[in-house]
Structure formats: C-alpha cells, structure tokens
Amino acid sequence: MDKYIFKKDSALTADLCKLCIEYFESSDRKEDDKSRGYKGIAASLEFDTFTDLLMILNLNMQSYVDQHSYLTRLYAPWRVDNVFNIQKYEPGYAYVEEHMEHGKDRRDSTRLLGWMAYLNTINNKGGTIWPQQNFNSSPKEGDLYIWPAGWTHSHYGIAAPEETKYILTGWCSFVGVDNT
C-alpha cells in the first residue's frame, strides 16, 4: 500500500473481467455522459448480478481495514455499496477532470472509500493519477485499487490513445443511506 492507496494485483480473474465486459456490451442500461469531464459510457449495476465480485471486494476491503484499523472504530457502520458502475472509455477518452469520490448530494456525502478495478490491460497510458500522492496506476486486467473518498485523494484518468479501456468503479459508504 502506498499513501493509503491499496493495490491488489489480479484480484479479479480474467474470466470475471471478460464476463463484466460482455455484460456491459450487451446491456441496455448504458449511458453516455459527457458532463464534468467524464467522457465514456457507464452502466450502473447491482451486486446480485455479480456475487463473486462482491466477495472479492469484501475480502480486499478487509485487507485494507487490517492495515488501517481505525476504520473499525468509526462512529457509524459502513460497507461496500450495492451499486457500482462498469465504464468504457474509447481511445482518446477518459475522466480527465480531477475529482474526488465524496460529494455534496446525500448519496455521495456518505462515501468513505472509492474502489476501481481494471477489466483489461492497456499498453499505452490509460491509467489513473492521484496527484497529491504522486501516484500513478497502470491499467492491468484484474488489478483492484482502494483509496479514501475525500479531497486528499482527488484523482483523474489519463486517456489511452489507441485502446479501449474498461473499468469497474464503486464506493464504500456509511450504512443507512439509500445507496447502501
């Protein structure tokens, strides 16, 4: 772990990554959203479709908590949100605006952690940069990242100039809000 950014190599199997991409491509729930620097297509899903993914995330969240025991002593319980996104970025596109996962609306304001998994390997650029930590990720199929949702871990994507990038992304939030 580097600067509270947890990385688990190959957390997702190649088969699970392929299944997620195939599900995304066949989904009628895709939305093309170009607001706030986001240039890609997303589909919001629930874990009842991907129970293996929820088990993998919970296992890795426990590893994150084991390294940061304060997370067990917070004033309210929290867990992996039931909803997550599959996102597709065509060559030359990325979420280029620096942003954080914690936000101002009711749902976003309860976020404690963000997570992201790469569904395919990108050979030229295509990663994510956390500028305040001077940390760059390299997109490798199955790799999972977990980080704090607040302003200290703002981040942005780098476009892959020649390859299509697929990611999963979601959050851990305090329990008792509509998205948990």
Where are these regions (language model features)?
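Fe(II)/2-oxoglutarate oxygenase catalytic core
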Residues: 1-144, 152-180
